[in-house]
């Protein structure tokens, strides 16, 4: 029994994608996914482009963004094949919110599209061999969406009227995915956080760091790496389905992985929050808080 416990865990296989991971033309059963960034750029040229020293992400209002896309989280820089690129448009991994409108817009935005994070992985035998991966979080999948929504709801319920900080972390899921001998060198990139600063006279718990919470999001990680042309086409279709804008349909089976919120935010704040009519609206451009940075606002250092 001890020997069985020591056996390495098998990595997810692409065979599951071709045999049923794409449930229908409108829904996909994918929680988390990993693929080389270079492969993502080739499969999604409308959403990402390398231009000089910039990694250009489709902005709200552009034709490519109207067809879907991803919410890219980062600190302004990404390292690909040993070269640093500046992100043209992204959501900061840490933001400060000061009122309910900021909170509502932030919540709607991060759940409106799949999340995308950049990580670098090295082999312990040869640290010079580094590969950049794109980590995808399917916010339309009910299991993933539930963890994020419940995390936000629970912290609000426990600190009503007080300031707090909430972080979502995917490091454990990703590190368990890679086999022994591989190391994620910038694991902190696999998290994002927001800090809600309330106008409270005595905010003792916040002052002493007692209102900081961390939600470790878990889920099945799909391996979307492939050199097969046939499977690359399948992966391309898979990514397009995952990131397509929400369209309401008459069939319940087509709506079961809907991105529309079930109203938990209403229960917490007791106010009317209606879902947006379409995810083609420029969500990021409407944000009143400084969460979206342009490429000129590059931080001074990169981890």
From Swiss-Prot:
Record GO biological process: positive regulation of fat cell differentiation
Subcellular compartments: Cytoplasm
General function of this protein: Involved in processes that promote adipocyte differentiation, lipid accumulation, and glucose uptake in mature adipocytes.
GO cellular component, one term: cytoplasm
InterPro entries found in the cross-reference section: MEDAG/TEX26
Organism: Homo sapiens (Human)
Keywords: Cytoplasm
Superkingdom as given in the UniProt entry: Eukaryota
Tissues where the protein occurs: Highly expressed in the visceral fat depot.
Record protein name field: Mesenteric estrogen-dependent adipogenesis protein
Keyword Cytoplasm: yes
Gene behind the chain: MEDAG
Main location: cytoplasm
């Amino acid at each position: 029994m001890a020997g069985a416990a020591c056996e390495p865990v098998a990595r997810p296989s692409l065979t599951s994608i071709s045999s049923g991971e794409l449930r229908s033309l409108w829904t996909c059963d994918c929680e988390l996914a990993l693929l080389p960034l270079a492969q993502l750029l080739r499969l999604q040229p409308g959403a990402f482009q390398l231009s000089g020293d910039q990694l250009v992400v489709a902005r709200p209002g552009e034709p490519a963004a109207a067809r879907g896309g991803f919410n890219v989280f980062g600190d302004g820089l990404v390292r690909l094949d040993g070269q640093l690129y500046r992100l043209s448009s992204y959501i900061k991994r840490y933001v400060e919110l000061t009122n309910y409108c900021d909170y509502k817009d932030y919540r709607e935005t991060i759940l409106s599209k799949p999340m995308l994070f950049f990580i670098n992985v090295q082999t312990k035998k040869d640290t010079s061999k580094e590969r950049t991966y794109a980590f995808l979080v399917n916010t339309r999948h009910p299991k993933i969406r539930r963890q994020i929504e419940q995390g936000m709801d629970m912290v609000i319920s426990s600190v009503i009227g007080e300031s707090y900080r909430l972080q979502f972390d995917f490091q454990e899921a990703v590190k368990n995915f890679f086999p022994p001998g591989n190391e994620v060198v910038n694991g902190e990139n696999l998290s994002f956080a927001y800090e809600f600063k309330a106008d409270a006279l005595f905010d003792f718990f916040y002052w002493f760091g007692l209102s900081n919470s961390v939600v470790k999001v878990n889920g099945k990680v799909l391996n979307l790496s492939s050199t097969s042309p046939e499977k690359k086409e399948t992966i391309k279709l898979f990514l397009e389905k995952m990131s397509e804008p929400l369209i309401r349909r008459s069939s319940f089976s087509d709506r079961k992985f809907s991105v529309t919120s079930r109203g938990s935010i209403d229960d917490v704040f007791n106010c009317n929050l209606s879902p947006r009519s379409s995810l083609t609206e420029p969500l990021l451009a409407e944000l009143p808080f400084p969460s979206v940075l342009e490429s000129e606002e590059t931080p001074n250092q990169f981890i």
